[in-house]
Amino acid sequence: MRAVREFNVVPAVPAALAPLSELAFNLHWTWDRETQQLFESLDPGLWKSTGRDPLRLLAAISAARWAALAGNPDIVSATNAASERLRDAVEAPRWFQGRRDSPLGLVAYFSPEFGISETLPQYSGGLGILAGDHLKAASDLGVPLTAVGLLYAEGYFRQRLNADGVQEERYPPLDPLGLAMHTTDVQVTLEIAGEQVRINVWKVQVGRVPLYLLDTNVEGNSPEAAAITNRLYGGDTEHRLRQEMVLGIGGVRVLRALGLQPQVFHTNEGHAGFLSLERIRELVASGFTFREAVESVRAGGVFTTHTPVPAGIDRFSPELMKKYFGTLAASYGVTFDDLMAIGSRDDEKDGKFNMAVMGLRLAGRANGVAQLHGEVSREMFAGLWPNVPQAEVPIGAITNGVHAPTWVGDHIAPLLAKSVGPVWDGADEASWSGVGKLDPAEVWAARAKGRAELVTFVRARLGDALLDPKALTIGFARRFATYKRATLLLSQPERLRKLLLDPDRPVQFVFAGKAHPADQPGKDMIRDIELFARQLDVGHRFIFLPDYDMAVARVMYHGCDVWLNNPRRPLEACGTSGMKAALNGALNCSILDGWWDECFDGENGWAINSADDDPDTGRRDQREATSLFGLLEREIMPLYYDRGNDGLPHGWIGKMAHNWKSLGPFITAARMVRDYTTDLYEPAAAGSRLAAADDKQHQRRDPVGRLNRTGLRQRPRARAVARPVAQRARSRCSSRHLDRPVPRRQFELALGNRLVGPDARTRRRRRLFPGGGNADRRRRYRLHALIRRA
């Protein structure tokens, strides 16, 4: 059974304040400042001591305090106003409701983690935070989206450093009854290695978006089955496979049990990739062949890859796959060897099942998360399309964004509301140009308040008189992976020490982040940072903040003047932490990688010279460290400390304004979700509707014989075949620009040369996904001619 943390039963909230319970259970409060202020006003001390958790706050308020609050007309009025704002947020028409001709009905968004609030610790890092921001922006825009994830009984680990500076992990158990979620009546079962595993479902409400979390810690399951959803990214490869079966296959079954029929299934990375197999199984069970089922599934499938390195992709051995899918392959209408072929590559000789390869083959649309990452992904997966030029590999790119209301601090938000407009999140370029009219003194005062709060936070966490509230403050916070090079500054320690101890122009650094428990090199980096920070002469200006989470991140984004990012290019897929800092007025200093590669304009921050053409890793690191120190010494420090007669750094403030103007319209999650909706979701929904219309004809017969999936006889005249197929191809190009030329990918789709077709160099893959050859090229040519005439 689940270990339960101590949780106090919430006393009866007075009737006059009854909406507080609803407000606490809908995570819309996490980005509604006025609702947060309402909760704080109930008891400021308790709000702080309970970690800004409304449920814990309501549980801790005494009956006497409740009576006093119920008699306070200001509190009652604020509660009713917050309730009205929530109702408006979940019911009022938004951007999507204005798209009256949109074919989109519902998107199912799958992710292994969701970072919505530190009060719901179901995330580890960038992927989860991005997923949380995606849900929030979808709610703000009114996009019809339902999310699916796993409920981890112990979440992700809490971090502490021992006497030697070494990271240690602890996993305090969570009680779902103490979290902002509700039970549901839904329970589904899934066969895993011969055991029928029961899966319960919890519902989290994120504005108007429901998030369903799957839980195997259920009475009646074996201890092994109950432990499947124990920890995020815990356990070995086999444990990961079991989790991904629950997420992908179990997730689809949960949606069906809830009566939901999404048109579009969005898979984030390969973790949920098995959802496509479950959808294929459903269609095969209804009478489709495997190839027909693949076409139907692909029509509504969207796959987003988040890693630029093969090592970041889940791959499972044939033996492990045999153990878990050996008896299930027949339900997909194929043999086990056929099933393995879906996730295999000719250039991977170990025969492992690659989740990203399967994701790409079974999704009709795919994208990276930045323009450079899209290029890297096309190169990394080009082997799946050996006859297609790399530039035409069908993997696009939608650059990530961040949910501005979640991450912008209380000191900066009023400035943006005054200069950009009350609805500044997602505003256009013309609106953002208004930041240039802000009073420099007002801007600098807001920046100083954020920095002072960071200093106060650090001192409360670590003690002592650490940091200087007036010194140039540089932040570095992210997962400690080797390619992110957190210790790059330590490669030239004397130069670093000179920066830290400058009596007139001091610089201070704040580091935070976790290393995966199995990543020893990442742990070593944390140890090296911590040991340097413990040196008496520099420890007051160089610190490591342990137990990094969303609360720590917010304080750092609000308080740092410069955000540092120095990965090895091009290994950073996107890297959204710099976006959050930028919205708070921080200036980025980064390698031109991820989002910064496309957003740096020469004036909105600094670019570290990259030596990615140097094959010697050690020499490359030294060259890039030298470039970084040069920027700090010759540009960043002088600009920050160049003060006018009024004591203000006008050059720095001007750079902040340009930073907002150039980045504000682009780096928000509102822009990102709009792009996903118009460029991926709506075209996929149109394709899914077309496939559904075809499905209705699947069982039809006429006097001549059974019809194929386009509603035509099995051996029709050539023109009778080509015309409907051409029309189908055109309809899948774009829901907005149907008159544009049909790209190569759509020809392949229309001709039955599936996404995997060009990779079909083995006999098995040719049989599963036919395509290629002179006959196919002739058919393609005829189709092209017909489309041009149409």
Label every PLM stretch briefly.
Residues 1-790:
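Catalytic cores of carbohydrate-active enzymes across secretory and cytosolic contexts
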